[in-house]
A protein has these predicted regions:
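Single conserved hydrophobic/aromatic residue that forms the stacking wall/gate
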Residues: 1-8, 12
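Extracytoplasmic ligand-binding site segments that recognize negatively charged/polar headgroups
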Residues: 15, 60, 65-208
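Short, polar/charged alpha-helical segment
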Residues: 17-40, 44, 74-75, 123
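Envelope-exposed proteins and targeting segments
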Residues: 35, 119-121, 243
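General small-molecule cofactor/ligand-binding pocket signal
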Residues: 40-42, 193-195, 230-232
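Structural motif
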Residues: 44-56, 190-196
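A ligand-binding cleft/hinge motif common to bilobed small-molecule-binding domains
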Residues: 70-73, 211-228
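Periplasmic-binding protein-like
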Residues: 178-187, 225-246
Length: 247
């Protein structure tokens, strides 16, 4: 990837586009102090926000952290370049082989992506507001939680929830199954307090909602901040995701 230098200060820069709360700001400061490279750091909430910005080329990002399915799309559309592992030996030394094996499902040969984080999508709930721990995705349609439900502002994840609720594959392309999921999401809308991504953390910590959809990494954080919260994976199953670094 090219080096970007300031004519005034001759300081090298790297432009990074990443999920919110994915790198401690102190880590960025340490990197800048150790390398002399300035990090220009932007955050996104969903892959669907990130992709068109990268595709348009309006911002010259050097490094981006998309999810598995989006890595595959970026490879297919020639938006990212192959990695030279000779220049990043720590990528193989410090990351377990099992993660590369999982990533090979969407990046054959691990040519384009270094795995960074993985997790699940599940239900976060407040034990003081939910009498019985949720066990099914359908619990997000329970009318007793009206105006206390938080859904993800993400087409992919919301459809995953609705598809799994009905016993379908989260990757279904069947039109009839997708229509059933669509109808369910429309029917659920009057019960939903808000469609959120990063805001779900503060809302659940503050006791502003009873139940919602959350990534497992966020769940670990919010449970640490509010012991009244708990996280479950519904019995119908869920999506396991991997986010990784690409150039």
């Amino acid at each position: 990837t090219p080096l970007y230098s300031s004519a005034a200060s001759d300081v090298y820069k790297r432009q990074v586009y990443n999920w919110g709360e994915y790198i401690d700001p102190e880590t960025l400061t340490m990197f800048e102090e150790e390398t002399g490279i300035k990090v220009v750091y932007d955050e996104f909430e969903t892959n669907e926000i990130m992709y068109p910005k990268v595709e348009a080329g309006s911002s010259a990002y050097d490094v981006v952290c998309p999810s598995d399915y989006m890595v595959q799309k970026m490879i297919e559309n020639d938006l990212i370049q192959e990695l030279d592992y000779d220049k990043i030996p720590n990528a193989k030394e410090n990351i377990g082989a099992q993660y590369y094996e999982q990533a090979a499902a969407y990046d054959p040969g691990n040519k384009y992506c270094v795995p960074y984080c993985w997790g699940t999508v599940g239900i976060i709930y407040n034990k003081t507001m939910v009498d019985t721990p949720p066990t099914k995705w359908a619990d997000l349609w329970d009318e007793k939680y009206a105006d206390n439900i938080l859904m993800m502002d993400s087409i992919k994840d919301s459809f995953m929830v609705a598809l799994k609720k009905n016993g379908f594959s989260s990757n279904s392309l069947d039109e009839s199954e997708l229509q059933i999921a669509t109808n369910d999401l429309i029917a659920q809308k009057p019960l939903v307090q808000a469609y959120v991504v990063d805001q779900v953390r503060d809302k659940m910590i503050g006791g502003e909602a009873a139940i919602g959809v959350m990534f497992s990494g966020d769940a670990i954080y919010v449970i640490g901040e509010n012991p009244d919260l708990d996280y479950v994976i519904p019995e119908e199953g869920t999506n396991v995701w991997i986010d990784g670094w690409v150039i």
